[in-house]
C-alpha cells in the first residue's frame, strides 16, 4: 500500500502522542503527574485526542471527514461573499465592547439575527460563539425547577453538559430514535410527577434533527404526536439541535423543522454555523420569551463578549448565500453523491458476503431509495476489533476519515465516519468504494485462511511504525 510521506509522518506523530507519560514522571510535581495519569487512560487505548492536522488540508488526502459540507470553504465562495459584506460596511469596529447585556450589543448583530429569524420562520434569533455554548445556554437557562427533560440517548455532549447544570429535577433518556421507547419515557415521566400531571410543570424533549454519529434523522412528526397524546394539557416543549441539518436539509438549507413545517411546534432550535456554513458560532431560535430567558439566565451569554463584527459578517455572508439559493446546487450534489455511494457499494460483488460476515455494514444505506432525502453522514461499521484496522487501511490509502470510538460513542459502538461533501467527486467516491471493498476482501481472505493472529497489511505497516517509535 503506497502511502506518501505526509500521511506516514502524520501517523508517526499520532503514534508518538499515544505513548504513556506518567510512568516517566516519578520526580515531577504531583499536580502534573496526576494530570498525565488521566491522559494516560486515553493513551492506553490509543484514543488521546491531539491537534494533529488532517492530511486533507495539505492536499495529501481526499476529504471525507471535515465539516465543510457545502464546500463553501473549499471553493472560496464564502470568502468572496464575506469580503463583499465587509466592503459594504467599511467603517466596522473589530471589537464588540462587552457582552450582549453589558455594553456589547450593536445594531448590526440585531439586524443579522432578525434576518436569520425571518428566513427560518422564527420570532427571534440569538447568536452564540459556538454550538456548544448555545446548547449549554439552552439547558442551563430554560428548564424550571420541577420540569423534566426527556432526551434521545445520542444527543450531543454539550447537551449533556447543559442538562447536568440545569434546574430540571428529572432527566430521562430513551433509546435512540425508538418511538416505543420515547412513548414509554414520556408516560413514565408523566405518571411519576404530579406537577406534570396537573400541568404546572413541563416536559422538555431534547432531540437532534440529524444525528452526528449515526447519520439518521429524527422522527419529529411522530414524536410530536406522541407528546400531544401523553401531555393533553400541552405542557411539553421540543428542543431541536439542527447542527447537522442547517444548510443541508430542506430547500435552501432551512433545516428539518422548517422543511416539515413545524416552526410553531418546536419551541427552540439550535442552528450551528461551524458545519455546512463553514464559519463559527450558532443561533438559537425561539420566541421573545425564550430569548429573554437566555439574555437573563444563560451564563455563557451574559458573561461572554458578544461576537465581533467580522464574526457576525461571515455568518451573514453564509446566510446570504443560502437565502438567495446560491447553495442549493451544492445541497443537490451531496444528495447525488451519497446515493451514488450507496448504489455503488451495495451493488459491488463483495457486498453481500461482507455484510453477512459482519465485515462491512452501512445502516443508513438500508432502503435509501425510499427516503425523501439522505444525509451527508455515513458511518461505516465493521467488527469492533477491526475498526482501527479499517481506519488504518483508509488512511494509508490517502482517504481522510474519522475513527469514532469511546467516549465519543458508547463502548462496543465504534465506527468509521465518512462525511460526503458537495465538493467531492464521483471519481473520489469510486475510489472510496474500491478501497472499502479491498479491505473487505482482505479480511475475508484472512478469516477464511484460518491463519491465527494474521492481520491486514495496513495494520502491519502501522504496528511496525509503532514498534519503530516505541
From Swiss-Prot:
Highest taxon above the source species: Eukaryota
Catalytic activity: aminomalonate + (3R)-hydroxyoctadeca-4,10-dienoyl-[ACP] = 3-oxopresphingofungin + holo-[ACP] + CO2
Top EC class of this enzyme: transferase
Subunit and interaction comment: Homodimer.
Modified residues (N6-(pyridoxal phosphate)lysine): 275
Binding annotation for pyridoxal 5'-phosphate: 212, 244, 272
Source organism of the structure: Aspergillus fumigatus (strain CBS 144.89 / FGSC A1163 / CEA10)
Matching SUPFAM superfamilies: PLP-dependent transferases (SSF53383)
Induction remarks: Expression is positively regulated by the sphingofungins biosynthesis cluster-specific transcription factor sphG.
UniProt gene name: sphA
Stated role: Aminoacyl transferase; part of the gene cluster that mediates the biosynthesis of sphingofungins, bioactive molecules acting as sphingolipid inhibitors via inhibiting serine palmitoyl transferase (SPT). Within the pathway, sphA transfers aminomalonate onto the sphB product 3-hydroxyoctadeca-4,10-dienoyl-ACP to produce 3-keto-presphingofungin. The substrate specificity of sphA using only aminomalonate in Aspergillus fumigatus is responsible for the biosynthesis of sphingofungins B and C but not E and F like in Byssochlamys spectabilis.
Designated name of the protein: Aminoacyl transferase sphA
Family: Belongs to the class-II pyridoxal-phosphate-dependent aminotransferase family. BioF subfamily.
Biochemical pathway: Secondary metabolite biosynthesis
EC number, UniProt record: 2.3.1.-
InterPro entries, alphabetized: Aminotransferase_I/II_large (IPR004839), AON_synthase_class-II (IPR050087), PyrdxlP-dep_Trfase (IPR015424), PyrdxlP-dep_Trfase_major (IPR015421), PyrdxlP-dep_Trfase_small (IPR015422)
One protein family per Pfam: Aminotran_1_2
